[in-house]
């Protein structure tokens, strides 16, 4: 089953959200 792909997607989303938050903090 696709548990691994799901967790990788979750981690990617979390990383992108963190990046967006960092960028907003810079602005």
Curated annotation (Swiss-Prot):
Gene Ontology, cellular component aspect: extracellular space
GO BP annotations, alphabetical order: adenylate cyclase-activating G protein-coupled receptor signaling pathway; diet induced thermogenesis; hippocampus development; intracellular water homeostasis; negative regulation of gastrin-induced gastric acid secretion; positive regulation of lipid catabolic process; positive regulation of pancreatic juice secretion; positive regulation of somatostatin secretion
UniProt-annotated location(s): Secreted
Residues with Valine amide modification: 27
Pfam families: Hormone_2
Alphabetized SMART domains for the sequence: GLUCA
Keyword Secreted attributed: yes
Keywords: Amidation, Hormone, Secreted
InterPro entries referenced in this protein's UniProt entry, alphabetically: Glucagon_GIP_secretin_VIP, Prosecretin
GO MF entry, a single one: digestive hormone activity
Family classification: Belongs to the glucagon family.
PANTHER family: SECRETIN
Function: Hormone involved in different processes, such as regulation of the pH of the duodenal content, food intake and water homeostasis. Exerts its biological effects by binding to secretin receptor (SCTR), a G-protein coupled receptor expressed in the basolateral domain of several cells. Acts as a key gastrointestinal hormone by regulating the pH of the duodenal content.
Protein name: Secretin
Taxonomic source organism: Ovis aries
């Amino acid at each position: 089953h696709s548990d691994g792909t799901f967790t990788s997607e979750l981690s990617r989303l979390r990383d992108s959200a963190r990046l967006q938050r960092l960028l907003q903090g810079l602005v």
